[in-house]
Amino acid sequence: MAEETNVDFDVIVIGGGVAGSVCAYKLAEDGHEVLLIERGMEPGSKNLSGGVFYCRVMEQVFPGFAEEAPVERRITRNCVSLINEESFVNIDYWDRRLEEPANAVTVLRAKLDPWLSEKCEEAGVTVMPGVKVDSLIIEDGQIVGVRAGEDELRSHVVVAADGVNSFIAQEAGIRTKEPMKHLAVGVKSVIGLPRKVLEDRFNVRGRNGVAYAMVGDCTQGVAGGAFMYTNEESVSIGVVMRLDDLEASGLSSSDVHDHLLSHPAIAPLLEDGELLEYGCHLTIEDGPQMVSHDLTRPGLVIIGDAAGFTLNTGLTIRGMDLAAGSALAAAAAVHEALEAGDFSQQAMDRYRTHLDESFVGKDMATYAKAPAFLERPRMYKDYGRLGAEIFYGIFDHDLTPRRHIVKVALDAFKRSGLRLWDVISDGLAGVKAL
């Protein structure tokens, strides 16, 4: 397309992560001229490590994704853990059905993003790495391109996939600077281990792996949680904490991270490992609230982290699958706009329609109350200790007479200092939120 002399491309996509690459690829596949701009010298260089990718959405874009893409391991075991200072209560779930087709994989973005970029180039996308977009070109309220240094690049539509600190969304007036209660800070390490050592310690084999979601003393009482998952020859482990609660605690994010790695249940798993990577990253904590607002302007759509498509339910932390899903919804709306030659606000708002009809919009609505539920401090300070006390009462076989489990649980509850109404309230809130 791009036949008009004052237009360089049909679409300019800013950001070469999962969202930006998927959107650019799909639009090029539909026959449009697309420019993908990436700030890093190569795609993936600005992304911290990777994560657990619930990857079935990628089969819609790249059939055989889990076989062809540079993924680390397939997650067939999921563990939910309550961590206390001297105890570790763990629910360990394994299911062969999660293996074929692959439900979730671990990825390292330094490997995945370049692969996605290559796929984009094969589809006809012009990929421009090492370029920082400075501002939008706005004429009569319409976004018509971007400025990068002294250069102007014009297009019918701009797609912003520039991450959680999206200055494009801020410049367009879609987002203001996020309050700290909507942000979380993640601190992650990647620890290298020989493949056999890793597989023996984590009880995984072949291409399969395990992911842990942890809560409690792992964040030293700060609202948030911890994660740990196996890559091919490394383990990614870290904490994610709500920024306002972390600041109020007086703790440093790095100290909390180190506290997790030294826990008696964690340290042996990482013993003699080599630190391959360490870093911090801001993420969205209240994604459902953010994405409920505007995501478009005439000639502009916002996708992925830039729009707030992250979801933490306490059991799973999702971002990449939602990023890919939002990219597909945006590509559908932009394709319709290009076919009609209409780049008005109304045309861009078709993005919202496609979102609401997709699993992305439906899941964000389903878990809209999850962030508020996860703010409850008892989640991080009381329930882990209660669980440990109950199990201690069950498994501690001293010389005193045994009691029924119900009696053990009731006695542990009485000693916990929790009020019955608080537990009922939290339970009801959890049912509604999750």
Regions found by a protein language model. Name each.
Residues 119-266:
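Predominantly flavin-linked oxidoreductase catalytic cores and closely associated redox partners
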Residues 329-380:
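Active-site-proximal substrate-binding core of FAD-dependent oxidoreductases
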Residues 9-36:
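N-terminal Rossmann-like FAD-binding beta1-loop-alpha1 element of flavoenzymes
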Residues 374-434:
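C-terminal auxiliary extensions adjacent to catalytic cores
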Residues 218-223, 232, 245-326, 343-349, ...:
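FAD/FMN-dependent oxidoreductases across multiple families
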Residues 99-118, 247-251:
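Short beta-strand to alpha-helix junction loop
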